[in-house]
Design a protein with these regions (language model features):
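Sensory/regulatory domains in signal-transduction proteins
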Residues: 25, 53-60, 86-88
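Short Pro/Gly-enriched beta-strand edge/turn motifs at strand-loop
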Residues: 46-53, 135-139
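A short core secondary-structure module
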Residues: 73-137
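Glycine-rich beta->alpha junctions and the first turn(s) of the following alpha-helix
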Residues: 142-190
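Fold-level signal for large, globular catalytic cores of enzyme and receptor domains
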Residues: 32-36, 59-64
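Internal helix-loop-helix
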Residues: 1-46, 97-98
Length: 190
């Protein structure tokens, strides 16, 4: 029986999180314009992604997330930062070795106001050579007992800059002047 279960757990594809949580997050959380730009790349596996919400110090407690996304109005960019080891994204499947992008949840700060935790589409590795971008720490945490094919990993940011459009905008927007607009029920984001 042990051999049977070992075999069955190995049937999960290393890109399972890409085709499930990552793709569905973009379909549900991205604006129509963002989805039109990213989904063809995702569907053709030109972008490989993961869903990075869980943090070491908070598990899946979204309210406790410490990773920050601070809006730089002058440059129209987000500065993504991991302020402590507790804020490292930890365990996301497909993150350790495969992902080039991550749907990452971070606490949104605009003009010193905390607007809560929102999702971002963040490039973490080059699609050309698969190396992490400067300001991104990413790696594999080793095998998971009984789930060897899943490459769980860790992710941290050191004042990593991404374009304003990295914020997934179906339910929220921050314009170039830093005005925050929520569309619909914020519970739909999680």
């Amino acid at each position: 029986m042990r051999v049977f279960w070992h075999y069955m757990t190995q049937l999960v594809s290393p890109i399972h999180m890409h085709t499930s949580m990552f793709t569905k997050s973009i379909k549900f959380l991205a604006s129509e314009e963002q989805a039109k730009r990213w989904l063809p790349l995702i569907d053709n596996f030109n972008i490989l992604g993961c869903y990075a919400q869980t943090e070491m110090g908070h598990g899946s407690n979204v309210a406790g997330i410490e990773t920050t996304a601070t809006f730089d109005i002058k440059k129209n960019e987000w500065v993504i930062h991991t302020p402590s080891i507790r804020a490292y994204k930890f365990w996301p499947g497909n993150l350790g070795r495969h992902s080039t992008h991550a749907v990452t949840f971070a606490r949104v700060i605009v003009s010193d106001n905390d607007y809560g935790v929102l999702p971002f589409m963040i490039p973490i590795r080059s699609r050309k050579d698969h190396l992490p971008y400067s300001g991104v720490k990413v790696g594999d945490i080793g095998t998971k007992m009984g789930y060897d094919t899943m490459d769980n990993g860790y992710l941290a940011f050191d004042h990593y800059r991404v374009p304003a459009d990295a914020l997934l905008k179906r339910f929220v927007n921050v314009d170039s002047e830093g005005n925050f607009e929520l569309r619909g029920d914020p519970r739909a984001i999680y």
